[in-house]
């Protein structure tokens, strides 16, 4: 091979190599040494979209109702944290639906600024945050009803004690309130709410409480609509305990009271009850109040001053109220000669000073006094007359029945 021939071959080989490289860049996408598949950019999955967080209260909203249930929702992701708070503290709530939504579970305070901070995470773990604020409506005290509860916190009461909730303003939407009113006990005992009026609700078990029962009352009505533009003012909670089972059985015909504790007869006491025209009521009564000494004036029970039946005694000893209308159990030393023999009182149950002092010393609010032997019935609304209502009728007195 001549020198010129050899150079020509080298040039031809170089041109061929350039042509092969150029072929690797043409529209076919074929690259020597590959199988002709798609490139890395085409096989990579598309990036997951960001989570989207929304709330049912607009940012900077004003005059939000205090009974508003705040809801936060996450789309294209899950909620990891939601905090609803004011300067006074956090509002309780919970994440539901596998992280899809958060719902508040407590009421809002009137005239208060709240901040909502929600964090959600998408499928790739990327977090987004939404922060918003709102202000609730202002309410006067005339637009808020406050609940008072009996028994008192920590009190030990008798087996007949109903839970008594009094509201200082009427509750017309009783069903809404009752949904937020609970009574739990250990051991558990079935019971029901009974609305005495728009201002008063009672709860009692089907039968007398078991001695030693521990009871918790939760009236969680803060921010709940009571109807007619009125809302619950605040939540109330009370814990109390049931003491020994005291049941006092009074027979107006035999003029005796049998005193039982936990089913065991302790004493039989001679007593007197209401005479003709002032008949003591028959039925189940509950000790409502206790006074070591109390003034009793006949005008408070409708007996006019100056009449033949009028009385005004400053120092009646060991008085225990059993009706709103004015029936008491108390010491009546002026009628000892009739006790155990005749009914001579104006409706109260009288006994000797010693017997009254003994009974007073063992008695608690809520102890039961069962009366028989007269033709005058105890009215359910005359004090804590809950046990004079049949169980079916009591259950029917619930706003949720």
PLM features: what roles do these ranges have?
Residues 120-121, 221-223, 263, 293, ...:
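Short, charged beta-turn/beta-strand-edge "cap" motif at the junction between a beta-strand
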Residues 166, 170, 174, 290-294, ...:
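Structured segments of extracytoplasmic/periplasmic soluble domains
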Residues 229-337:
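Gly/Pro-biased beta-strand-loop elements
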Residues 159, 282, 298-401:
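Exported/periplasmic cell-wall-interacting domains
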Residues 2-244, 271:
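Acidic, low-complexity Ser/Thr/Gly/Pro-rich repeat segments typical of extracellular/periplasmic
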Residues 201, 242, 249-252, 350-355:
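Short, glycine/acidic-rich beta->alpha junctions
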Residues 142, 150, 246-254, 387-401:
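Short peripheral tails and domain-boundary helices/loops at the edges of structured domains
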Residues 71, 115-117, 131, 164, ...:
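Extracytoplasmic/secreted envelope proteins and their assembly/folding machinery
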